[in-house]
C-alpha cells in the first residue's frame, strides 16, 4: 500500500498542539525524515529562539523562519513540524500549500495552557496573562490554519500514537 495523497507532510497549529511530538512519531511510522523548523532555526543561529527574539525581534525571527520553511518544503518525503506562527507570513503559507499535505493539529485553549504554562523557551508566552495571550494568538492565527489545512485533527484527550494513526489512515485514504 502506498501513500497516494502525500509527498510531504506539514504539521501546523498552535504552540502546545503536539506538532513536534506527533511529527516524530509519524515520521518514524512512515519511515520519513523528520524536521522541526524551530529546531533547524536554532541550530543555524547557534542560539535558542528566545535569544533570537531578544536580539532580532519577532521580525528577525520571521525572516529566518521564512528562509528555513522555503528550504525544507522543497525536500521530498519529509514530515515537518512548524512553529505556531508560521502561517502569518504569506510566503510560508504558499510554500506549505504548494509542496505537501498540510495537517492542522487542533487543541483547546485549556489543553494548550496546560502544555505551555511552564515553558520558558517560548518568547511570545512570557507574559502575566498567559491564557489571554493564547486566546489572542488563536484569534489571530486560526483563520490561517483553517484556510491552509487540507485536513485537521484534534489532539486533546488522544495519545500521540492515536493521532499519528488517524493521520496515517487519512493519508492512505481510509478516512
UniProtKB/Swiss-Prot annotation:
Its main location: cytoplasm. One of its GO terms (biological process) is amino acid biosynthetic process. It is found in: Cytoplasm. Its cofactor is Mg(2+). It catalyses: shikimate + ATP = 3-phosphoshikimate + ADP + H(+). InterPro entries: P-loop_NTPase (IPR027417), Shikimate/glucono_kinase (IPR031322), Shikimate_kinase/TSH1 (IPR000623), Shikimate_kinase_CS (IPR023000). GO terms for molecular function: ATP binding; magnesium ion binding; shikimate kinase activity. Mg(2+) binds at residue 20. Monomer. This is Shikimate kinase. It comes from Legionella pneumophila subsp. pneumophila (strain Philadelphia 1 / ATCC 33152 / DSM 7513). The gene is aroK.
Amino acid at each position: 500500500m502506498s501513500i497516494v495523497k502525500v509527498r510531504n507532510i506539514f504539521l501546523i497549529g498552535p504552540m502546545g498542539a503536539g506538532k513536534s511530538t506527533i511529527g516524530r512519531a509519524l515520521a518514524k511510522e512512515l519511515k520519513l525524515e523528520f524536521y522541526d523548523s524551530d529546531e533547524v532555526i536554532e541550530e543555524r543561529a547557534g542560539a535558542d529562539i528566545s535569544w533570537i527574539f531578544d536580539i532580532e525581534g519577532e521580525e528577525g525571527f520571521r525572516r529566518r523562519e521564512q528562509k528555513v520553511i522555503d528550504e525544507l518544503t522543497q525536500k521530498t518525503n519529509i514530515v515537518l513540524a512548524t512553529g505556531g506562527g508560521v502561517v502569518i507570513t504569506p510566503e510560508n503559507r504558499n510554500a506549505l500549500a504548494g509542496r505537501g499535505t498540510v495537517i492542522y493539529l487542533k487543541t483547546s485553549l485549556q489543553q494548550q495552557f496546560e502544555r505551555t504554562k511552564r515553558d520558558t523557551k517560548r518568547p511570545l508566552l512570557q507574559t502575566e496573562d498567559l491564557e489571554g495571550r493564547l486566546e489572542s494568538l488563536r484569534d489571530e492565527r486560526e483563520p490561517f490554519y483553517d484556510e491552509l489545512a487540507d485536513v485537521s485533527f484534534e489532539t486533546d484527550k488522544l495519545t500521540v500514537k492515536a493521532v499519528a494513526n488517524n493521520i496515517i489512515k487519512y493519508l492512505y485514504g481510509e478516512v
